[in-house]
Amino acid sequence: MPVIIEQDARAGALAQFLFNPELSEGSLAYYLLGEGIGLGVIDNGTIYYGEHGTATEIGHVSIDVNGKPCDCGNVGCLERYCSANAIHEQLNANPSIVPGCETMTHAQACAALFAKANAGDETATLLMLDVARYVGYGAVTIINAFNPTHIVLGDIIAQAGQPLLDEVTQVVRERTIPEIGRNTRITLSALPTDATVTGAAAVAITNFLEHPSMFFDVA
């Protein structure tokens, strides 16, 4: 049985491209907002890998040269400010925002924060909007670097919903060249929260169709 390995954000991008007809035209950037921050880019129907397969590591773009240290060896990496891990770290430092967050998973802590924000809790809302602004800074970088037709926000942080999308859109309007920013469509993922699972199926399907000899003896 063939085994195919793919990065989670790229698999998610392929799932968005194959299973959402609205995203099948133009170029697509799947902005994975999970325990880490990732990016998968599809242009002309093809996943972009770069020379050594390490392209589109948006989570390790430094947005603060004097910022928080990252395990990658850099400082100020985007995912230190808007990943589920980073949010949970902030909640653990301020446990009154989400009582009991210390015993929660990263996804549970984020869901609890977003629920409180949606219920009108001011402190939770401020933290959620701060995270959304950092997501927006990443979106600006994606637009400037790749000029995609679509940016799709997915995974744990995207569950913040419309308030997240509104703040990201506002940051993009403020920080991109108007003619470019307004022609980039930013949406929330319409696929299940963990689009990478759907993406794994998409990777298998694509390889089956493109390389049938991997699966069958066609000699």
Which positions does each model-derived feature cover?
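AAA+ ATPase active-site-proximal loops
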Residues: R10-A11, I37, L153
